[in-house]
Amino acid sequence: NKGIGLTFMTKYYNEQVETASRDQMFYIQSLALTRKIKQVYENVPLYRQRMQEAGIEPGDICSVEDLSKLPFTYKQDLRDTYPYGMFAVSMDEVVRIHASSGTTGKPTVVGYTKRDIEMWSECVARALVAAGTQKNDYIHVSYGYGLFTGGLGLHYAGELIGATVIPVSSGNTARQIQILRDFGSSVLCCTPSYALYIADTLREQGVDP
């Protein structure tokens, strides 16, 4: 997949969706929300219990304007249902698992279906194109590849665009700088603080970033 009609110097990855009118977006979001509420009510015991306690049924959620009717989900809920208790599909449909670092307790676990990965990749592709990324770019990914979703999300998004992805991953700043120079990277994907650190390191080497 080389993108949806993506050509050089385009502003959109999926122009039809990204330029939808407010009314069209309201309809798209509301339709997706009502389907998702029905799915989690039927498949996630905690969500069903919370909605019943609040006197809410799936049919009461008709649009995004009804979001305020829904009860909150708390961090402790994710810990109490660790690892798979919040999944709304069977494990047979889960093709990948990502998770937070768990620095404050148990990690937050997210299961991805094949469709989830496709949707996530397109969402990130839209963001990359909106930031100016094109098919002829070399994308240097400095996010970690592992349980954190950042590296892989950007990796697959870059491939959807049709750009060349360089999966450097995190750490070893000297190596990062060498690859940025030698491979002709034109897009750097990393945290803002790490981009500044790379710039500072270059200045220390007498190079204007």
Model-derived regions: residue spans:
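Conserved ATP-dependent adenylate/AMP-binding module captured primarily in the ANL superfamily
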Residues: 121-138, 172-185
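Conserved adenylate-forming
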Residues: 35, 46, 152-209
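Nucleotide 5′-phosphate-binding alpha/beta core
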Residues: 1-99, 104-122, 129-130
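Short acidic, glycine/Ser/Thr-rich loop/turn "cap" segments at secondary-structure junctions
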Residues: 105-112, 136-143, 180-184
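N-terminal Rossmann-like NAD(P) cofactor-binding module of classical short-chain dehydrogenase/reductase
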Residues: 98, 140, 189
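Short glycine-enriched loops at secondary-structure junctions
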Residues: 94, 117, 144-146, 193
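Conserved AMP-binding loop of ANL adenylate-forming enzymes
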Residues: 129-163
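Short, flexible loop segments at the rims of nucleotide/cofactor-binding pockets, characterized by
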Residues: 116-117, 143, 163-168
